[in-house]
A protein has these predicted regions:
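Tandem CBS (Cystathionine beta-synthase) repeat/Bateman regulatory domains
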Residues: 1-156
Length: 156
């Protein structure tokens, strides 16, 4: 007969909560794209959550790629409003979403950033680097990507 105290429970599943970066840097939808670029540089971020000016509620996301496309199209970032360039109603994941499932969402949707939602609303953001790092660390350690416990990445 086996001693019940000798049995080990499975490690907890690693979720986006383990790798996300709170707090999220936000910018208002009516600000200029140039202001978003400045905030990204200051916060060392590659994406910002866009909020509605009156309520502060998240309404979109703007990324480095969005800003690059505006500049490549000959637009002056100080003449373009964020709402004109942002992705409205971006795909989000729940705080309990596994890292593997987040990778699937990112791959199928070709997303580089995913806002993370909790019971109280927006709680963080994960990017493709966070997810890849966690998957690589899980692979190197020989564990499942769903059971890896990656180190917290540096804040953006």
């Amino acid at each position: 007969m086996t001693d019940p105290s000798a049995q080990h429970s499975a490690p907890p599943l690693a979720t986006v909560a383990d790798i996300m970066r709170p707090p999220v840097t936000a910018v208002e939808q009516n600000d200029h794209v140039g202001a978003a670029a400045y905030l990204m540089k200051r916060a060392d971020a590659t994406a910002l959550i866009v909020t509605q000016a009156q309520t502060g509620q998240p309404v979109g996301i703007i990324t480095e790629a969005d800003i690059s496309h505006a500049v490549a199209d000959g637009k002056n970032p100080n003449d373009v409003r964020i709402y004109q360039m942002m992705t409205a109603r971006p795909t989000v994941v729940n705080i309990s979403t596994s890292i593997r499932d987040a990778a699937k969402v990112m791959t199928s949707g070709r997303f580089r950033h995913l806002p993370v939602m909790g019971d109280a609303g927006l709680v963080g953001i994960v990017d493709i680097t966070d997810v890849c790092r966690a998957l690589l660390e899980a692979d190197v350690s020989g564990s499942s990507a769903d059971t890896a416990q990656p180190e917290q990445s540096s804040p953006h």
